[in-house]
Structures are given as structure tokens and as C-alpha cells.
Amino acid sequence: GDFTFTGLAIHEVRFNKMPVVGNDFYPLDEPQPDEVVPDPSLENTEFAIAIKGIFHGWDASLYGAYFFNDDSYYDPLGYEYTLVDVIPLPGGGVQPIYEQDFVALRRHARLSMVGGAANVTSGSWLFKTELAYTDGYKYTNTEDEKAQWKWLVGLEYLGLKNTTVSLDLLQTWLDDFEPSMMNLPDFAVETQFETALRISRTFLHERLELVFFGLLRGGEGEDGAFERLSATYDFTDRFTAGIGALFYQDGDSITYDNIHDNNRVYLDLTYSF
């Protein structure tokens, strides 16, 4: 078979941006602590490698990475006291009243990940599986680091003209789980099962694409779900227009419980220079 080796180094670390306080998708009732972003340096550089082999009817990959977690944890610094009132006491003197605030910084843990993947084709079917082990997770409500396993199995069907149907099942396990990790601000769960379904079809000589994507968290959607419908049309090689709708359902997950009323209709215009 043919083998390829890929290496990657990211010198400048960038994390996903949280919605601002008051946004419909902001999950908390109060502002988060300040975030610590690692300075660009050799010590903070993220690395990833992958080895892929392609054989007759199937392929396999091994990969590893050393990177920062996009999700942050709170590093507590203590408490800050602010004088908010003074109460006069009988016989003289006063009683100060202080407001206590928890002070912390948001930091990102350094993670180590190893994994593998395999894909097998049979006629119009593609079968795929992935397994990954990641160590180094840190949480606010526990002191020791945690490890996580992720296992994905999926299939794609390409037997219909201009149509692709894919179904993926993902199971996540968190080792050495502690009940305190379920509390604010971690909201961690010991196991999480997810199902993703994507159906796409092209029309008009592949200039128009219709896509349905649905994600179900939990075996019966008890942790929330969402669906996305979209249509994209290529007017020219440079100009593309799209329209779509997003629908959310709540569940036991605080994220979906907070956003289940945030259904959206959107328009996307893209011009490439």
C-alpha cells in the first residue's frame, strides 16, 4: 500500500470564542473570569503527527497530538471582599458589611492524544471507525487530571445519484469520574452517547446543494438535540449564497437547556476574491 506521513506545528495558540454575556447562546448567568491565553513560544507550540496507509478497499491511520484544550477550567485564586454597607451599632460603633466574590482565572490544560482510524469500502458503502485516548484534562471541581476515551463508528451510503447519506455513533468515557465534576462550571458527565445523521443531495449540475444534519445527544435525546437544514447555490465560481434554519431541543445538558428557544433562520453570502 501507499503510506503518507504528516506533521503539524501551531505556534500561535487560539481558542474558540465564547458568546458575550447576555447573548442568547451564553450558558451562564454571570461573566466568566479572565482567560489566560498562552504566549506564542516553542514551549507552548502545539504539535500533531499522522501516518496513513492506503490499501485495496481500505485505509488505516495512526495519529497523535500535543495541544491545549479549547475548553477552559477555573484556577481559583481565593476570595475578594468589597465593603457594601455600614450598620450603626447601639452604644456607638459600626458594623461593616462585606460582599464576598470568588476570584479565579480561566486556564487551558495541555492535552496528549493518541488514536487510530480505519475505513473500509464495499460497493456503495463506506464503513469507518475511530478510537482516541486523551490525557491531561483539568476540571475546576477536582484536583487530579483526567483521561478520556472516544470511540466512533459510522457508515456512508453513496448508491443514490448525487446523494450522500452518513450516520455516525460516538461514545465518550471519562476515566476516574467524580460526582463533583457535574457541578458548575464543569458540567461534566461520565459517559456521553451521540448520534449524527447527515443527508446531502446536489442538483442543477452540482450548483445547488441541499443538506440536512441532525445531532442527538443521549440514546433518546435526553441530553438535547439540534437539526440544521440548508441550501447553498453557486451563482459563479466566486459568489455563493446560502439559506438555512437551525432548531434546538432541550434536555438534561445545561447547554441545550439554555438554548432550546434559540431557533434561527440565517442567510449566508460568500464572495471569494
Label every PLM stretch briefly:
Residues 18-24, 73-81, 139-148, 176-184, ...:
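Outer-membrane beta-barrel translocator domains and adjoining extracellular loop/strand segments
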